Amino acid sequence: MKIEKIMDALSTIHISNTLNESEIHKEIGRALSIHNIKYKHEYQILTHKRFDFWIDGIVLEVKKSKPSKITLLNQLDRYTKVPGVKAIIVVLERNVTIPKQLNGKTIIIKSLNENWGITV
């Protein structure tokens, strides 16, 4: 699976800022399906932890609000060490600046506010 195809699907989503994280997951799932991208939702790969979306080695991690940078980096550090993870796309409501690579894996930030044009 090419990251570009996933990013194209994500760029088609326009959501209200009143949606909760579960509703955002539904919108992402709908966009991925429309673009014929097969995914696993709430994919359990770590004990007591699930990836929001798993797409052939690419993890989509969804955050409704702006997370703590340290907390996010710690989470991404754990995720990038999981065998089979090739890249992580972090879908955020607000942008956070983090490295573009971690443990040799690509990290991409997709900001709802900047890239999706949240509707009110």
Where are these regions (language model features)?
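Short glycine/proline-enriched coil/turn segments at helix->beta-strand junctions
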Residues: S33-I37, I55-I58, V82-K86, K105
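Amphipathic coiled-coil/heptad-repeat helices and related helical stalk/stem segments
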Residues: L46-T47, L72-Q75
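Conserved catalytic cores of phosphodiester-cleaving nucleases, focusing on short active-site segments
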Residues: F53-K66, Y79
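Nucleic-acid nuclease catalytic cores
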Residues: K66-T71, T80-E114
